[in-house]
C-alpha cells in the first residue's frame, strides 16, 4: 500500500514518541512529574522552551504546579478555554490523587483534552514504580474514552487518534501504554509527520459541522441568520422604516446564502440600509456569527475575557437528567467516532488500527486476550506454538472504554477456551470480556443487544494475573497459559509465581 504519510523512521521510546506528537499538536500542557510518565512532560517542555511551535504555528505553554491534583485541575481549566489541544501526563498515585478532577474533566465534556498515561501499579503493601494497570482501571469509572497501545509505534499513532476522537466526540481520552515496558523501551518507529497531523486533526480553532444532533443543539442550533435578526431587532429604532424592511427582507430571501457566508462576501450588499454608526458593528456581527450547525473543533466552554461559572449545583430535578444525556447522546456515540478516526488514520498512514486487533485467530481454538505490551510477547509465543501445530491466537484490545463488545465477540466466537491476561489484580478486563460474551449468548435467543453477534455457548474462561509491578514474564509462562487451556483449564492462575504445598 502506497500511503500518503508512511511515517518518519526513527528509534524512540514510548514517552518520547508521545511527547513528540504532543509537541506537534498541543497548544498547552500542564503536568507534574511522576514515574514513569515524567519524561513525557520533560521532553515536551524541552521542545517548547527551545522555541518549538505546533503545526499551526502557535507557540504553546507549559506549567508545572505543586502536585498532580493541581496539574489536572489546571489542564481542565486550560482546555475549557477552547481552540487548542491540551494534555496532562500522569501515572499511578498521581492519577488517584487527581481522581476527582478527572471525573469533572469528563463530566464537562472537555473536547480536545487527552490524558497521557504511562501505566504503573498503585503502591499497596510496598512502593513500586513499575508497570501495572491499576491506574488505568481506576480511570474507568470517571468515564474517559481509553485507548491502549502495545509499543512506541502504537503509543504515537494512538496519541494522534486520541486528539481526533476527543475533539469530535467531546469526551476526553486517555492514551495509555505500559510504564517502562513501553514508555522506556527503545523501538524502531514510524513517527507521524507534521503534515499528517495537520491534515488528520484539523485546526483546533477552526469550524466543523456538528457531527451529531446533540452537539448541534448544544453549540450550533441557531446560526448566523438568527443572530443577525436579533441584532436588527435590538437596533430597529435606529433605522429608517424602509431600510429596516429592506434589511429584514434581504435576510429572509437569502437565508441559505447568508448562513454559509463565513467570509462576509454578502455583507456589502446590506450596508446601505444601516445607519453609518452601526455599519462597523454589523460587519463584525456578520463575521463573528457562526454558520448554523457548526462548532469550533475544540469548543470554548468559558470566555477568559468574560469569565463565568460552570457546573453549578444541581439537585434532585436535574442531576440525573444530565447524566442520562451524557451517556445517551455523547458516550454512546464514541465507538463510531473511534472507528472512523482509526479508519481515516489507517488510510492515510498504511498502519491499520481497529478497536480490537486479532492475530492468527481465524481458525484458533484457544485464544489469549490482553492489553498493552504483553500482547506483542503473546504474538511471538503464538507464532512459535503454531509451528508446533497448536491452533492458538491473540486478541489485543486497543479500545478499552467504551468496550468494543461487538468486535470482541466476533473475534472469540466458536473458541473452546479464552485466557484474559491481567496486569492487575482488579481484573477489569476479565469483567469486560465476560460481559461482552454474555451479551452474545443472550442474543442467541433473539437480538437483545443490537450489533453484537449471537453465540450459542461461552468458551472456558481463565484469568491469568501477570507482571504486577513488572514481575518478570518469560515466554515459557505464556506457553503455560496456552497449555492450561488445553489441559486442566484452571479458571484463575498466576503467571511466573511459584506456589509451595
Describe the residue ranges of each PLM region:
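Flexible inter-domain linker/hinge segments
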Residues: 1-6, 226, 230-233, 243-245, ...
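Thiamine diphosphate
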Residues: 1-137, 143, 160, 179-180, ...
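A general structural motif
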Residues: 125-129, 337-353, 370-378, 397-404
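Conformationally flexible catalytic loops at phosphate/diphosphate-handling active centers
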Residues: 60, 173-357
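Peripheral docking tails and interdomain loops at the edges
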Residues: 421-501
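Conserved thiamine diphosphate
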Residues: 127-179, 191, 200-226, 457-468
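Short helix-loop-beta junction
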Residues: 46-50, 340, 380-394
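Redox- and metal-dependent alpha/beta enzyme cores, enriched for Fe-S-associated oxidoreductases
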Residues: 355-390, 403-410
Amino acid at each position: 500500500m502506497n500511503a500518503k504519510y508512511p511515517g518518519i523512521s526513527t528509534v524512540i521510546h514510548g514517552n518520547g514518541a508521545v511527547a513528540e506528537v504532543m509537541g506537534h499538536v498541543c497548544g498547552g500542557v500542564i503536568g507534574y512529574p511522576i514515574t514513569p510518565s515524567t519524561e513525557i512532560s520533560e521532553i515536551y517542555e524541552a521542545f517548547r522552551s527551545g522555541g518549538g511551535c505546533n503545526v499551526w504555528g502557535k507557540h504553546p505553554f507549559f506549567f508545572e504546579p505543586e502536585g498532580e491534583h493541581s496539574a489536572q485541575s489546571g489542564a481542565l481549566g486550560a482546555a475549557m478555554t477552547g481552540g487548542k489541544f491540551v494534555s496532562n501526563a500522569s501515572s499511578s498515585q498521581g492519577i488517584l490523587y487527581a481522581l476527582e478532577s478527572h471525573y469533572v474533566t469528563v463530566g464537562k465534556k472537555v473536547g480536545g483534552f487527552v490524558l497521557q498515561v504511562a501505566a504503573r501499579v498503585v503502591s499497596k503493601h510496598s512502593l513500586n514504580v513499575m508497570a501495572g494497570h491499576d491506574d488505568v482501571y481506576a480511570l474507568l469509572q470517571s468515564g474517559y474514552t481509553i485507548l491502549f497501545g502495545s509499543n512506541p509505534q502504537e503509543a504515537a499513532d494512538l496519541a494522534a487518534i486520541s486528539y481526533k476522537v476527543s475533539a469530535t466526540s467531546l469526551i476526553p481520552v486517555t492514551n495509555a501504554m505500559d510504564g517502562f515496558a513501553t514508555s522506556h523501551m527503545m523501538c524502531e518507529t514510524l513517527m507521524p509527520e507534521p503534515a499528517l497531523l495537520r491534515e488528520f486533526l484539523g485546526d483546533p480553532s477552526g469550524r466543523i459541522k456538528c457531527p451529531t444532533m446533540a452537539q448541534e443543539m448544544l453549540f450550533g442550533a441557531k446560526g448566523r441568520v438568527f443572530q443577525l435578526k436579533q441584532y436588527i431587532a435590538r437596533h430597529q429604532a435606529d433605522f429608517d422604516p424602509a431600510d429596516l424592511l429592506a434589511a429584514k427582507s434581504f435576510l429572509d430571501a437569502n437565508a441559505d446564502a447568508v448562513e454559509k457566508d463565513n467570509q462576509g462576501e454578502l455583507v456589502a450588499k446590506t450596508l446601505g440600509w444601516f445607519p453609518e454608526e452601526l455599519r462597523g458593528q454589523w460587519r463584525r456581527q456578520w463575521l463573528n456569527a457562526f454558520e448554523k450547525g457548526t462548532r469550533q473543533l475544540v469548543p470554548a466552554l468559558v470566555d477568559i475575557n468574560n469569565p463565568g461559572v460552570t457546573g453549578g449545583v444541581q439537585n434532585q430535578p436535574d442531576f440525573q437528567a444530565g447524566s442520562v444525556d451524557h451517556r445517551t447522546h455523547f458516550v454512546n456515540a464514541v465507538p463510531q467516532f473511534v472507528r472512523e478516526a482509526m479508519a481515516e488514520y489507517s488510510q492515510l498512514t498504511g498502519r491499520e488500527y481497529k478497536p480490537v486487533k486479532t492475530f492468527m485467530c481465524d481458525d484458533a481454538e484457544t485464544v489469549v486476550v490482553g492489553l498493552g505490551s504483553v500482547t506483542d510477547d503473546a504474538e511471538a509465543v503464538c507464532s512459535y506454538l503454531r509451528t508446533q501445530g497448536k491452533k492458538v491466537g491473540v486478541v489485543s484490545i486497543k479500545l478499552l472504554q467504551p468496550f468494543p463488545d461487538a468486535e470482541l465477540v466476533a473475534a472469540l466466537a466458536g473458541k473452546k477456551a479464552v485466557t484474559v491476561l491481567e496486569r492487575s489484580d482488579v481484573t477489569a478486563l476479565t469483567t469486560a470480556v465476560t460481559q461482552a460474551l454474555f451479551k452474545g449468548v443472550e442474543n442467541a435467543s433473539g437480538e437483545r443487544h443490537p450489533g453484537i453477534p449471537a453465540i450459542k455457548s461461552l468458551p472456558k474462561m481463565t484469568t491469568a494475573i501477570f507482571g504486577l509491578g513488572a514481575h518478570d514474564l518469560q515466554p515459557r509462562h505464556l506457553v503455560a497459559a496456552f497449555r492450561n487451556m488445553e489441559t486442566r483449564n484452571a479458571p484463575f492462575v498466576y503467571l511466573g509465581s511459584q506456589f509451595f504445598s
